[in-house]
């Protein structure tokens, strides 16, 4: 009788564990952001010469495979859609947890987003959904996560259960994990029709516009972190954009201002 009870208990526990694992794997948001970051953590430890940090400018404009074919260096983008400067410090720590790159290139458009572009919880989850459990993950969630939804950052299926976002590119993510590496090295993009309206010419334009106070404060805080930690392998960039509207031109001008602030801290 006792043997039968033990056997039944083992079966129940096994079923519960299997159900938990299935929910954990299948009920997560699967999109290009998760596939890209999951792929980053699959890269061999300390195998990357360059890591690029930023938002869509990085993974749509730079090809790690082409860079290797043309110039012989290994690289990977640690980048998510609409990634913003608040998260850069945590992301630097994530990069350093598995890689020791000769260069970390940071595309800084994410320092110029206005409040309308800061749906912060969505952007945070694009990062934390792929992060392995670590002190940095705990610190990041404690600093930026919603107090009422703490559990869902560690168990994403709590958040995405029954959601269409849990399906997304699930087959692609399964293929990634079966393959064990990212075939495209994080690159992603989509086709668009060519813009036929007026494009503002900014060649040689050095005009500046003040950054909002909160934006400048966060930028300076991140730069101070880089300086205090002697991150000599960090360089900053602002990838080119087609400027078609006044608000984009003003962001371009703020980019010029940002460049001057970056120089104040001794960085290029």
Residue spans of the language-model regions?
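Short catalytic/ligand-binding loop motif for oxyanion handling, primarily in non-cytosolic enzymes
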Residues: 60, 112-116, 166-168, 243-246
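Extended hydrophobic/aromatic segments used for targeting, binding, or gating
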Residues: 214, 221-223, 227-229, 233-268
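Secreted/periplasmic serine-hydrolase-like ester/acetyl group-modifying domain
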Residues: 123-230
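Short hydrophobic beta-strand that contains or immediately precedes a catalytic carboxylate
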Residues: 50-54
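Hydrophobic membrane-insertion alpha-helices, especially the h-region
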Residues: 7-27
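Alpha-helical transmembrane signal-anchor/signal-peptide segments
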Residues: 28-48
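Membrane-embedded segments
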Residues: 57-144
């Amino acid at each position: 009788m006792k043997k039968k009870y033990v056997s039944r208990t083992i079966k129940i526990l096994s079923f519960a564990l299997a159900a938990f694992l299935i929910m954990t794997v299948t009920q997560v948001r699967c999109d290009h952001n998760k596939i890209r970051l999951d792929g980053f953590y699959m890269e061999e430890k300390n195998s990357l010469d360059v890591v690029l940090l930023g938002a869509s400018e990085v993974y749509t404009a730079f090809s790690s495979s082409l860079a290797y074919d043309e110039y012989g260096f290994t690289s990977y983008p640690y980048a998510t859609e609409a990634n913003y400067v608040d998260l850069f410090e945590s992301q630097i720590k994530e990069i350093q947890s598995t890689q020791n790159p000769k260069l970390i290139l940071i595309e800084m458009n994410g320092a110029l987003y206005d409040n309308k572009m800061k749906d912060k919880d969505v952007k945070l989850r694009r990062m934390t959904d792929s992060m392995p459990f670590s002190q940095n993950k705990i610190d990041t969630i404690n600093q930026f996560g919603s107090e009422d939804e703490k559990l869902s950052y560690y168990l994403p299926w709590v958040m995405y259960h029954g959601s269409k976002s849990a399906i997304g590119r699930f087959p692609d993510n399964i293929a990634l994990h079966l393959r064990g590496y990212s075939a495209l090295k994080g690159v992603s993009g989509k086709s668009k029709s060519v813009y036929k309206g007026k494009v503002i010419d900014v060649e040689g334009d050095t005009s500046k516009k003040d950054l909002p106070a909160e934006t400048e404060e966060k930028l300076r805080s991140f730069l101070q972190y880089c300086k205090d930690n002697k991150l000599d392998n960090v360089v900053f960039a602002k990838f080119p954009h087609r400027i078609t509207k006044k608000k984009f031109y003003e962001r371009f001008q703020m980019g010029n201002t940002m460049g001057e602030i970056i120089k104040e801290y001794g960085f290029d």
